[in-house]
Structure formats: structure tokens, C-alpha cells
A protein has these predicted regions:
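Active-site-proximal segment of RNA-dependent polymerases
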Residues: 33-58, 103-115, 122, 154-207, ...
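Surface-exposed loop/turn segments and immediately adjacent short secondary-structure elements
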Residues: 1-129, 143, 369, 375-376, ...
């Protein structure tokens, strides 16, 4: 493992490095200088009383949905364990769930721990940041969050803008790709200078501000009981990072959402939808200039933390967009790393390109551009550009054929 220019080999040193990294990430409270007046965004308030109803048969129904042998958390219990022993453990589990519903979180921390297992993002990863953290959550906490996720899933479609497709039933990643593809082709056909800004959000799930999350939930109409349960689950959570199969020192969470928790993705997109509302509102009141004389449904595309924004390449729009991103980052903890972002010019002249390079400290790229795993282009793809996709599908065919064999 590398720490700067130093190579460390002892388990104790690597464990200390991993602990420091994640303690500064999830074990440090989010500092907030500003927040957002959500009332100014004009988002509706929903009737969500049904989410606060007592838990009943849905507990057992959720257990029946649990994968039987999925990797367990620190307690070692799998879905199969719950199903096999339900007649024995039913009363205790139902009592524990009822305690949570009533706002009694005493000793919940014992049932809300997790292991983080590190999955390499690339070949020969040598730094902690080059590993993706996946949480293996305690079975009880995972059961409760799955129950809450099942309740919320049916309401997300009406609560989250249509340009966010992640984690919502009957929405697909292709929707976002096609929306951006059609918009960039249309803008190119208009022969007017425009840009597509593709953002990199830093450590998205790990840095969500709990205070901002609760502000968003209350503004949407979530009741006090639901918000209290979310508070209890967040504040009682702890994590140990697995290194060579050995759990490290425990980290008490102070911010962020677990990757591997069934409810976390849904809470995350509710937070991200505020960014969409900010850009939409700025467009409606004329702070951002229109992209075309013809109406374009969305100037921003969101797929989880994947953000793409269409703008006019002028100083006012670019500076305002950076200010909106900065405000959202300060309020929510989700900061755009502009240096790691990309900007793609559409029909831009030399003076436009010079202005873009002066105001946006990010790499400027050309189409075709890989977006959500597919080549985004303003022209018909050549055979050479399509070939990598064909090769990738060909590599998958043997596995697909094996799945069809009985």
C-alpha cells in the first residue's frame, strides 16, 4: 500500500492508514457554512402519512424477499437464517422493530454495525482511495432499512424529477442517455454555441450532510416519525473496515450514507434532486439563458451522482452555475470537483473556447464521449467507434449462453 511516496507493508500500518482515511470521511461531521432555502424552489409537499404506519405483515414479507445466502454483516445472519428460524425469533424481531417505530433507539448501535469490504476500482490499486467501499450491514439494520425502502419505493416516482432515473421503478439508465443524446444533437443542429458540462461529484454517498437530508425530507412532507427513524438509524451506525479479512477499529458515523444499505440510494436521490430544482428554478426566473427558442424539457441530467448540464458558453451562465454548485456542495456536502469534470463544446467558436477555458478549470473534450457507458455523439458513429461496444457484447455472450443451458 502507498501513502504518498512511502510504501507500507505491515498489517498494522495499513490498518492505521485505512482507519485514518475512513474516519476523516464518514467519522467527521459535515461542516456547513450555508444552507438552501428550499421554500424558494417551489417543490410540492406530499401526503406521506402512510409511511408512518405501524409495521405489521410487511416485516415477514420483507424477510421472504431477502436473498438466502447474500454476504452477511457482522452478526453473520443471512436471509436464510431469518426464514428458517422465523417461528422462534418472530416475537423478538417484531418487538425490536416496534421499539424503532416508537422512537426508542436505546442499544440500537448493537444492531446497526457494518463491515466495509474494499473492492478494487482498477488493476494494481495501491492507495485506499482506489478501492470502492461496500458495506456489509448487520442483518437487523438491513431488514429495517429494506422495510422502509419498500414503503418509499412506491412514492419516489412522483417525488423525484423525471430526469433522474437511478433507483426508481420503471425508470432506466437508457432514459438519461437518450435525453442527453437527443439534446446535444438538437443543439448542434441549431448551429448555436452551447456546452455540455459533465460533473464529477466527490465521494458522493460518503459525504451527504445528515442535517441537509433531514431538511429535504421535512420539506417534502415526511412525518416526524419517519424522520426520527432515519435519525436513529444514522446516528447509531458504526463501521469496521475489513483488511485481509480482519476487522479494524470501529468508526462512528457522523455523515454519509452506506453503500449496501437498501434505503440509502433512495435518500441520496432525494438530496440530489435539490440540485436539479436549483438549476430548473434558475432557468425559470431567467438567471440562466434559454438553450433554444424551442422548449427543451431538461437542461440537466441526473443518474444517481452522475450529473450532466447544458449551458450557454457565456460568463454569466458559467459563473452562476459554479455558484449554484458551490452553494449545493456547501449545504449538502456533495461538492463538484470541477478539476476532474469535463466540458464538451457544441458548435463553439474560438472566442467561446477561450472563455470556457478561462472560467472552467476542467478538461475540454470532443464528441464522441463516453456517457453512462455508451458513446455520446452529435454525429453518426463510425465503425471504429462502434467496434468496442461490439467486442464488449461478444465477450459477454459465452456467459449468457451458459445461463440459457439447463
Amino acid at each position: 500500500m502507498h501513502v504518498g511516496d512511502q510504501v507500507i507493508t505491515k498489517h498494522e500500518d495499513k490498518a492505521a492508514t485505512v482507519l485514518d482515511f475512513y474516519d476523516s470521511l464518514i467519522g467527521t461531521e459535515c461542516a456547513r457554512g450555508r444552507t438552501i432555502n428550499l421554500d424558494t424552489l417551489g417543490s410540492p409537499v406530499f401526503d406521506l402519512e402512510a409511511l408512518d404506519l405501524p409495521f405489521s405483515e410487511e416485516v415477514w414479507n420483507t424477510i421472504k424477499e431477502m436473498p438466502p445466502d447474500k454476504a452477511p454483516g457482522p452478526d453473520g445472519f443471512t436471509g436464510r437464517s431469518y426464514k428458517s428460524c422465523w417461528t422462534v425469533i418472530k416475537n423478538d424481531v417484531m418487538a425490536a422493530v416496534h421499539f424503532l417505530w416508537t422512537g426508542n433507539f436505546r442499544n440500537l448501535q448493537k444492531l446497526n454495525s457494518a463491515y466495509i469490504t474494499l473492492i478494487s476500482k482498477k488493476t494494481n490499486a495501491v492507495q485506499v482511495k482506489e478501492y470502492r467501499p461496500i458495506s456489509l450491514v448487520h442483518s437487523f439494520a438491513k431488514l429495517v432499512t429494506k422495510i422502509l425502502a419498500n414503503r418509499l419505493a412506491g412514492r419516489l416516482d412522483e417525488m423525484v424529477s423525471s430526469n433522474q432515473s437511478a433507483f426508481i421503478k420503471k425508470r432506466f439508465i437508457q432514459d438519461n442517455f437518450m435525453m442527453v443524446q437527443q439534446t446535444d444533437k438538437f443543439l448542434h443542429s441549431q448551429k448555436q454555441p452551447r456546452i455540455l458540462l459533465k460533473l464529477d461529484i466527490t465521494k458522493a454517498f460518503d459525504l451527504v450532510s445528515w442535517a441537509f437530508l433531514l431538511e429535504v425530507l421535512r420539506k417534502l412532507g415526511f412525518g416526524s416519525r419517519w424522520c426520527d427513524m432515519i435519525c436513529g438509524l444514522l446516528s447509531s451506525s458504526s463501521t469496521q473496515v475489513l483488511l485481509n479479512g480482519i476487522p479494524g477499529e470501529g468508526i462512528l458515523h457522523r455523515r454519509g450514507l452506506r453503500q449496501g444499505d437498501p434505503l440509502s440510494p433512495m435518500l441520496f436521490i432525494l438530496v440530489m434532486d435539490v440540485l436539479n430544482q436549483m438549476f430548473t428554478r434558475a432557468s425559470e426566473v431567467g438567471l440562466l439563458q434559454p438553450l433554444s427558442s424551442r422548449p427543451i424539457q431538461h437542461r440537466i441530467s441526473l443518474y444517481a451522482d452522475d450529473v450532466a448540464i447544458f449551458l450557454q458558453p457565456n460568463a454569466a451562465d458559467i459563473n452562476l452555475s459554479l455558484q449554484l454548485l458551490d452553494l449545493f456542495g456547501e449545504a449538502s456536502g456533495l461538492r463538484a470537483n470541477v478539476q476532474k469534470s469535463n466540458v464538451l463544446p457544441i458548435h463553439c467558436a474560438e472566442e467561446n473556447l477561450a472563455l470556457i477555458q478561462n472560467l472552467l478549470p476542467c478538461e475540454m473534450l470532443d464528441f464522441p464521449y463516453k456517457y453512462l457507458g455508451l458513446p455520446l455523439t452529435i454525429k453518426k458513429l463510425t465503425k471504429e467507434q462502434v467496434q468496442p461496444i461490439i467486442d464488449r457484447i461478444a465477450d459477454q455472450l459465452p456467459g449468457w449462453k451458459a445461463d440459457l443451458m439447463t
